[in-house]
């Protein structure tokens, strides 16, 4: 485990608790009083682990208000990105259970927050409103009237069932920008099907390509990539729509299907099939356009990635192996010859890497400028000088837990760097603040709404 001095500002660590301690509810104050505030990041600017731009300078999206009414990641992650660059994000949750992501992932000492929630629900205020009740819908529309962006990811038709169709929302706020993320998009014959990242990976063709030839397709990693990718496209759409709104004063609707966001990044599989009828198949860790191009195990049981995509790169690898003859035109110096002798070239690489430790392989390849990298575990990353020098980790104080290390803000902007102001908030931590200060609702009325479980 990494030393705390390199990763945190104290020795405090999140408390391990059993899965049974994570529940679907959060205690709500018995009166109209606001719950305690959210945590702030406090590393000094010189700390390489700190978030860029931890001062109070105005960020580019300051003054933009975002309503995030989705669950999990597909869509809400776009709100996280906007929040990192100054937008105010109001997370609308059901009063009893909140976002189900609060209960997914590694448990913490807080019964309403897993580590996944803390990391990915960053830079938000939690506001509890029951959208299944008419008074809740009325409150929600008041928030919409005072906001710039709305993000939702329910199954198509759900918002309409609650009386929150796009025409209703647009009439409430003509300048509203609405991002709708769903498994299959808002139109088409499959629009009402449930959609999660795993299903989107399969439907889009990504899972078909993951694994080794002739074997069972595997998950492309353990992270819900589709949710993140769809959110990134959604965030791009929001920024484009904001620019359009600056020019015209009008908002617009943004529709992203998770599957199509994944499909969009699968390089040339569509034109290859459309023109030549070629179906891309699983390649394991390899590539159909280059060899050696894969993962190789070293003598000490560790792994490296080597990617020789050009003849020059292979020439450098041959020099690193101290076998320059391999790159001769008569052997494997030409890419077409290497591809034709794929198994032989891979076996040569396997044997060479297997005769050395990973550090030795890395040193020899780097000396010859061969594209090479270690297959890092998270423990490796916590101790890697480049991760630390780039400030890729942020140490944030989480209420009731202590310091938590999370991925830092991406992208890095020179003049207006983003920041992590707080981790996933306690359920309803800003309900009173938002209703009282933004909507000018009296404390007595807030108390009544709470007693009726509308908030």
Swiss-Prot record:
The active site is at 227 (nucleophile). Gene3D superfamilies: Crotonobetainyl-coa:carnitine coa-transferase, domain 1, formyl-coa transferase, domain 3. One of its GO terms (molecular function) is succinate-citramalate CoA-transferase activity. Keywords: Carbon dioxide fixation, Transferase. It comes from the Bacteria. GO terms for biological process: carbon fixation by 3-hydroxypropionate cycle. Residues 7-28, 48-58 have a biased composition (Polar residues). Residues 1-58 are annotated as: Disordered. The keyword Ribonucleoprotein does not apply. Forms a large complex composed of six heterodimers (alpha, beta). Belongs to the CoA-transferase III family. Involved in the 3-hydroxypropionate cycle used for autotrophic carbon dioxide fixation. Catalyzes the transfer of CoA moiety from succinyl-CoA to L-malate to yield L-malyl-CoA. This is Succinyl-CoA--L-malate CoA-transferase alpha subunit. It comes from Chloroflexus aurantiacus (strain ATCC 29366 / DSM 635 / J-10-fl).
